[in-house]
Amino acid sequence: MYALADVNSFYASCEKVFRPDLRNKPVVVLSNNDGCVIARSPEAKRLGIKMGLPWFQLRSMKFPVPVIAFSSNYALYASMSNRVMVHLEELAPRVEQYSIDEMFLDIRGIDSCIDFEDFGRQLREHVRSGTGLTIGVGMGPTKTLAKSAQWASKEWPQFGGVLALTPGNIRRTEKLLSLQPVEEIWGVGRRISKKLNTMGITTALQLARANPTFIRKNFNVVLERTVRELNGESCISLEEAPPPKQQIVCSRSFGERVTTYEAMRQAVCQHAERAAEKLRGERQFCRHIAVFVKTSPFAVTEPYYGNMASEKLLIPTQDTRDIIAAAVRALDRVWMDGHRYAKAGCMLNDFTPTGVSQLNLFDEVQPRERSEQLMQVLDG
C-alpha cells in the first residue's frame, strides 16, 4: 500500500503560516518578477481568480474583499517542504519526495496496527501541528491509485481530506474510477486524454478495463503501466533516493532591462551562487559551467542578441568561489555593450559524485583546501 500526502494550496499556505491575520482571507502568489498568478488560496479560488492571470489585470479587478498578493519566495517553500518531509518520516518508514508539495509513503503492514484512514488522519494532524500546513492523504495498492484517491479526497469534502482505496473494497475503487475523468489520472496529459476520448475512453474505469496490449500498441509502455496500476498491479516502485540530476539551471527574466555590465555581472553571480547551493544539495560536483544572456525577442524595435559561453574546469568542484569565477569568465566572453538585456542564467553540468580528478603531472591547479568545510558553513 502507498499513501500520497499533498499539501493543500502549498505556496499560498506557506505565506499564511507566518501571517495568522490572513486566515480565511484570499491570498495569491505571483511568478518571478510578479508576472502572473501561480498559486491561490481556497478563498482566492472561490473569487474566481484563475491560474496564470496577469498581475496587472488582477490589480485592477474589484472584489468584495481585498486580495493579498505575495511575490514568490522559493527559499521559504523549500524550507517548508523539508519540514513536511521530516514530519512524515517520523510516522512512515519509507518516504519519497515526488515534488515540492507531494510525498509518497510506503504504508505496507500499517493496517495490522491501525486502520488506513485513521493513519491518514494521524498524518494530517501530525503535519498540521508541526508545520501549520494541511495535507490531503490518498491511499491505494499502487502509486496511481493512491494519486486517484488523493484527487478524490480534494474533490469531495465529505472525505475529510483522507481516502483509502483498499484491495478488499473493489466496489469503492470502481465507483471512484468511474467518476474520475481520464485527464485527471496521474501521468495522462491533455494530448493523450484527447486521443483516448476519441476512442470512447473518458473515465479512469474505462481506461482500467482497456486491454494493456492494445494501449501499449496505440500509445506507449508508460500508459500501459498506468492501466496495470489502475487494476492494482504495482509497476512503479518507491524512490527514496531520486536519481541525480544531469543539469542545474538558475535563470530569471529581469523586471527592468539590464544595460550595464556591472548589473549583469551581479545577476550572473547570484545565479551562480544559487546553482552552486543546489549542486551541493544534490551532493554532486560539476566540471562544466555555462552562462547565457539574451535580449527580448518581442522587442521588435530593438536588435535581438543572445549568446552563451561555457568554461570547463580541470577539477570538478562544488565550491561557490570556483563556480562564480568561471561564470564571470564566461560572461566576459558574451557580454556586448549597447543592448537591453531581458534574461540571463547560469547552467551547471558534467556532474560527478566526487571532486577527484586525474591531473596531469605538470598541472598547477590544485583543489582548494578546506573547501568542503567552508561550504558547509555557508549552507548553514
Please name every model-derived segment.
Residues Y98-E102, G140-K143, Q284-H288, H339-K343:
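Short Gly/Ser/Thr- and Asp/Glu-enriched loop/turn motifs at secondary-structure junctions
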Residues V28-L30, F70, D106, V227, ...:
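Residues in well-ordered beta-strands of folded domains
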Residues T134-G136, A290, G345:
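Residues at or immediately flanking beta-strands
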Residues M103-G109, M308-L314, S357-D363:
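Short, hydrophobic beta-strand segments
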Residues M1-R228, L238, E277, V365-G380:
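Gly/Gly-Pro- and Ser/Thr-rich, intrinsically disordered tail segments characteristic of DNA damage-repair
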Residues D322-D379:
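C-terminal hydrophobic structural anchor segments
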Residues E184, K194-R340, V356:
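DNA-contacting surface of Y-family translesion DNA polymerases
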Residues G109-I110, P141-A146, K294-A299, N349-T354:
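Short, internal active-site loops enriched in acidic
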